[in-house]
Each structure stands twice: as C-alpha cells, then as structure tokens.
Amino acid sequence: MYLFKKIGAALLLTSTLVLASQVQADVRIDIKNDSSEDCSVAFNARVDKTKWLTEGWYVFVPGEEGPVILKGANDVHDVFIYHDCGLTPTDRDEVKRAWVKVNLKFSDYLPKENEKDYQEVQFVRLNSPAYTIGNRK
C-alpha cells in the first residue's frame, strides 16, 4: 500500500509539472499617454517559438494610463509596440515590420500581408513592461 501511495504521489507531481510547463503566461504592459493626442496602440508579440500575435487597437487619451494584458505572450522582451502618435525608432531600437488592420480592432495569429484593410507598419521592441507615448529620448 505504501508503494502505491508513493507511485500515486509521483504521478500526480509529474502531471502537475507537465501541465504547468504547458501553461502560457500573459504579459502585462503599462501604457501612459504623455502626448496631447488620442493615441492608438498595437502590439506584435511572440506567443511560442514559431507563432506571433498582432493585436490592436488600444486607444489612450492624453494623460491616460492603463495596463494591457497580452494573452499567451511569455516575455515582455518578445513584445513589439506600434502607435500612431509619431513613433520614430532611434538607431538603438530594434524594429520589426508587421501588418495591422486599419481603423478596426483586430487580433491576428497569421500574417496579413497585402490583405484588404491592412497596412504594414514598423514596431519597436519593448525594453520594459512600462511604456510612455511621447517624450521618447
């Protein structure tokens, strides 16, 4: 009986560890709009080794602060951001091009290259879980 309890406990622990390793984390990004305009924000995030999620639009009015939760993203360093309030990458920024839906909310796991109502934009890699629109130096 003791042996069965030990085997059962080992199986339970193993199955718990396997399930925990398969669960995807979510990434929280705190956005603050320091500009004088309403700003629409989109994200391009790695959700596993070969898949990317492109999602938008999150609209922030001037002075607004708030979190965005990217479901399935595992690491903030695998997240790129785009916004329509004068995002100009610097020489030290890592950039990535992706397609966003024009003027409509979207969540895409497949590239939408040259599809109707989509345009290609340049995203910038996030360096931290907090991002301020405007006053970029």
Where are these regions (language model features)?
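Bacterial N-terminal signal peptides that target proteins for export
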Residues: 1-11
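Glycine-centered signal
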Residues: 1-2, 18-22
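Short, intrinsically disordered low-complexity segments
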Residues: 4-5, 16, 91, 96
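Bacterial N-terminal signal peptides
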Residues: 10-18
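Intrinsically disordered, low-complexity segments enriched in small/polar residues
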Residues: 21-34, 38-73, 80-137
